[in-house]
Amino acid sequence: MALPVTLSGRSLAPGFQDTHLFAPRRVALMADPAIAASAVLARNLAAGGFRGALHAVGAPWAGMDHAPDLAALAEAPHLAVLSLPPDGIGPAMDALAARGCFAAVVPGPAPGLAAHCARTGVRAMGEHSFGICIPPLGLNASLSHMAPRPGRLALLCQSSALARAVIDWAEGEAVGFSLIAGIGTNADYGFAGGLDWLARDAPTGAVLLDLRRIKNRRMFISAARATARTRPVVAQRPGHAGRDVADAVMGAALRRAGVLRVQGLEEFLSAAETLGRVKPSLRPGAEGARGDRIAVVSNGLGPGQMAADAALRGGARLAVIPPEARTLLDLALPEGWSGENPLALPAGQGHRLAEAASLLSALAEVDSVVAIHAPAPDEDPEVAAAALAAAAASTGKGGRAAPVLAAWLGQYSAGAQRRALAERGVAVFTTPEAAVQGALHLAQHRRNRAAAAELPSAEVLEVTPDRARVSALFAAARAEGRVQLDEAESLAVLSAYGVPVIPHRAAATLDEAVEAAAELGWPVVLKVLSDALPAKTEVGAVALDLRDAAALRDAAAAMEAGLAAARPGLRPRGWMVQRQAPPGRELRLRLGDDPMFGPWIGFGRGGTAAPIEADESHDLPPLNRALALAMIGRTRVSRLLDGWRDHLPVSREGLAEALVGLSQFAVDFPEVEAAVVNPLRARPEGMEVLDARITLRPPGETGFLAIPPYPASLARPFTTKDGRGVVVRPIRPEDAEGVAAFVRRVPAEDVRYRFFNPLRELPPAQLARLTQIDYDREMAFAAIAGDSIAGTARLVLDGQEGGEFALLIDAAWKRGGLARHMMGRLMDWARGRGLRRIHGQVLAENAGMLRFVQAIGFATRRSEDPEILEASLEL
């Protein structure tokens, strides 16, 4: 069964195939000569050297065959480029659909394009698309001012001006492209479809995204994660940086997808330089590490120190060279080298840069190497550059050594060497700081990959939440016509999810408040209990440190008088009495809702000054402890949590558990619109929520998680016919080593039957594809027997109400019913998703599998390949 180990291409319209958009063999230009862009498109198409059939349909254009209309073409085009007046787009798409062409690019304005696509089934990039360039095919159906060269970089963009700027920069840096696609306004075919293609496009080594508008958050994150598992993905979103929570939530979504976010064109191009040339290290253990240990070597002390300073400013670490490595360096390098990181070579020894970089790259203590060359008399920079290019190429083989980045200084004299290094695939920069930024991009990419591999379950709390209590509180509020919970109700909800709250009592009358204070113990805090007071301190509705009944009654009288003046007509629900909390660090937790990415979690500095401090990190639910701890670490206030002078440290683990509780709450109750926990007061002895406010959505509305949780509820035990037990559960990223060992253990013939290839060792990228899956678009079950895997079963949605299956069982576990059970689990999952059929490919010589699938109801037939049979089952 040759199930692709990447995701199948989504085909959202009958007749549409993404190969027709991204690998067309027949292209038609339908262009109005009165539109200025038409001449640019025609010129680029004719000059591109397209390896397929190219036709001008309607108006003739030089350099391509002409047909008066689509009916005159011998075969339907795979792709049409429509440079027509707005009122001509709809009729043109009708004609395309009638002729059997279902992929189009629309460079100009096209009001109603989404409706045209829905009506005709034609998928279109646009409106205002830059066009599409596929340099390996010689296709340039774009508004570019120059032809991009072939290479490993892909660009999905919304801005035509930015696309031209990147193409121009790339030519100067000898960077080539596998694909450039202009999404335009994202009216129909958008980023998710393009990323789906790039996830399995072998020529693409790295992806650049120019983001402005995303239509479907879940599809985008799903596709971005699929792509980022196997190659770096870099994104920039201009016009929003640092301005609002929405921008921070966008950053969180990209991080969870494994995408590196950058700010501005300069950093965008810097990331392209690094990730377009450098393959991130695949050395064992590197994936989960910070990846920020940088070694610097230069032919002069000053530039090396500048690089070291830049690394430390960027939050990286200078790699520590172990004693045994120092001995090797002493033997290899000339006398007079600095002996520490940064390594400075003696004068006139610039040609030894390559040797030093190779030695450093091989060290397990080094994640990346920055090699710096400054102009020097009596040195041949071309020799040094050639040697470094060879060294960088050798370290890149196999992905086990740390990558080498170069800074070749000298604006006037070093241009030729930089060009030579770039031509040979070395990431080369003009300053030490820029090279270090490239190393930081590699480190952040590795951390993002680790974050994307985190798959929190729908159940991650140590205690079981009291969901029934929360449901009852919500029902009571809605019965009163309220969507706003009061403070007592909000604290009760948090307590139900294991978040510590301050001891408190709600009182309907002042006498009850005095009794509650006596029960809690003096001193106490008194608050007005109301769902209509989001900021009680601003209207004097809070009194602190009340030490007896008289003080409490006086405070209550003052509050009533103040509220009567400030908020006439307000009817409080009563009083909230809390034990006076000891001093501590005030923090804030938030749950909000983003129009694009749905529910989000925030953590940062609390208290009344929290909005001014603007010290908050954000992430998307579901969270686990690792993600929550990372959230805490991204704030400035986190540095104070570890202790400072007379402030004792606070437990980050306890705070992480509170964040996980808030995340679990968001997963369980999508009808919640917002929650604010402020302040949460943290001390060395523990923490307590002092105030909280929860808001429900209007009746009938519900939220939608951008990232689905790990489906832990699908785990089931199974006992084979001979009494052996396994647990069949959805596969997880941490199963990668187990899957690798499983494939090595299974007989070679069975592996060949499964992958149509005599594999014995799965490469890391393929292991990632097999174990880091999107449960919205595929399911893979693993049968766990102790600490090993006994079998795997997989089903990938094909976009046409079906899915493609694959099955592999360890020989020691065959004939016990495990294969039938796992296929049954796939069928149940498929039915639950509303699929109508499942299908797979079986080698004709695989008699055992053919008998098995026929026995469980599959029909088999010959495919176009005589060596392969198609097996299918209607559900």
Regions found by a protein language model. Name each.
Residues 2-691, 695:
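Catalytic-core regions of core metabolic enzymes
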Residues 701-875:
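Long, contiguous binding/interaction regions
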